[in-house]
């Protein structure tokens, strides 16, 4: 009987490891580790860094988002682009404590296979620097913003506005009229 109990415990551990590997693989294909640069007039420089982990999925497979949320232990599932009619949902985690204590450790234990793992490393470095208050000093904010703007292939708006934003963070929209970062 003792052997059977031990085998069940080992089987449960194996099942959890396989489930975590599934979640990591799913996120590798459908997830995003992102640090937005958002205008915020109430901050000293008029801008803020907003780290976010997100995973999207069609409404027919929304249960996978709930599985990911259960495995990482945090996040909110909601409609993706509420004005859109594409019937997709998204799991979003923005709370820094959850990113630091749940999301980042999960993906450090279960690294992604693709080059997206580089985004995880950069994301973790930025979020940890923010936790230390690096973004509260102008030179620290500029360094983290520059690093954030290199993530996710530069993004459409990021490529266009990157240099202008870093050189003049108070007025990046004055001449261009486009958002720095569109989700």
Predicted segments with their positions:
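Sequence-level preference for short, compositionally simple segments enriched
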Residues: 1-183
């Amino acid at each position: 009987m003792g052997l059977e109990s031990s085998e069940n415990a080992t089987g449960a551990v194996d099942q959890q490891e396989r489930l975590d590997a599934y979640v990591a693989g799913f996120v590798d294909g459908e997830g995003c580790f992102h640090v937005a640069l958002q205008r915020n007039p109430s901050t000293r420089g008029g801008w803020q860094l907003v780290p976010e982990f997100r995973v999207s999925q069609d409404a027919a497979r929304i249960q996978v988002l709930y599985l990911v949320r259960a495995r990482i232990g945090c996040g909110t599932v909601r409609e993706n682009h509420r004005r859109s009619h594409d019937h997709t949902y998204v799991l979003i985690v923005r709370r820094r404590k959850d990113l630091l204590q749940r999301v980042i450790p999960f993906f450090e234990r279960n690294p992604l296979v693709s080059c997206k793992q580089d985004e995880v490393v950069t994301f973790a470095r930025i979020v940890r620097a923010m936790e230390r208050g690096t973004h509260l000093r102008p030179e620290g904010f500029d360094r983290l913003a520059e690093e954030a703007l290199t993530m996710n292939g530069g993004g459409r708006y990021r490529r266009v506005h990157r240099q202008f934003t870093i050189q003049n963070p108070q007025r990046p929209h004055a001449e261009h009229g486009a958002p720095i970062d569109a989700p």
